[in-house]
């Protein structure tokens, strides 16, 4: 009798554990689907539309001292990622031609563009946050 009670108790505990795990997984999946759906919205509806590309400090000295762009996760929910190839299609970032422009928004940030002497398209600011080795593409 004791063995049967012990088996039932263990089974119930395992059931609670799996229910908890399923709950966590389903909330994670929902969050991922929400982020995917947010990224498909038209840009003007995205209040937190901010893409992040990492400029790795380890590689900063290489390639003639220019930062190399690699993907990094978004800083906060609602932010979207653009790959380097997508950024290049837009004509903003080419690894060989990163130009710093006068600061935009605050002194720790500078304009970045692929074309010397020309700022990026209106409403888009590629800036280098000097406190964090990251490039952000934020709508103004």
From Swiss-Prot:
Name of this chain's protein: Myelodysplastic syndrome 2 translocation-associated protein
Domain of life: Eukaryota
Disease affiliated with this protein: A chromosomal aberration involving MDS2 is a cause of myelodysplastic syndrome (MDS). Translocation t(1;12)(p36.1;p13) with ETV6.
Origin species: Homo sapiens (Human)
Assigned keywords, A-Z: Chromosomal rearrangement, Proto-oncogene
Tissue expression per record: Highly expressed in peripheral blood leukocytes, spleen, thymus, kidney, pancreas and lung.
GO cellular component assignments: extracellular space
């Amino acid at each position: 009798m004791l063995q049967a009670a012990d088996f039932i108790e263990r089974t119930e505990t395992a059931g609670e554990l799996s229910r908890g795990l399923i709950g966590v997984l389903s909330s994670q999946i929902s969050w991922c689907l929400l982020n995917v759906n947010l990224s498909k919205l038209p840009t003007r509806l995205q209040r937190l539309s901010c893409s992040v590309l990492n400029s790795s400090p380890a590689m900063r000295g290489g390639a003639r001292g220019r930062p190399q762009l690699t993907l990094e996760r978004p800083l906060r929910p609602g932010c979207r990622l653009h790959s380097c190839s997508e950024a290049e299609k837009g004509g903003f970032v080419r690894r060989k031609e990163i130009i710093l422009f006068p600061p935009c928004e605050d002194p720790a940030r500078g304009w970045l563009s692929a074309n010397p002497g020309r700022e990026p398209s209106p409403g888009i600011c590629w800036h280098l946050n000097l406190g964090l080795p990251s490039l952000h593409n934020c709508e103004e």
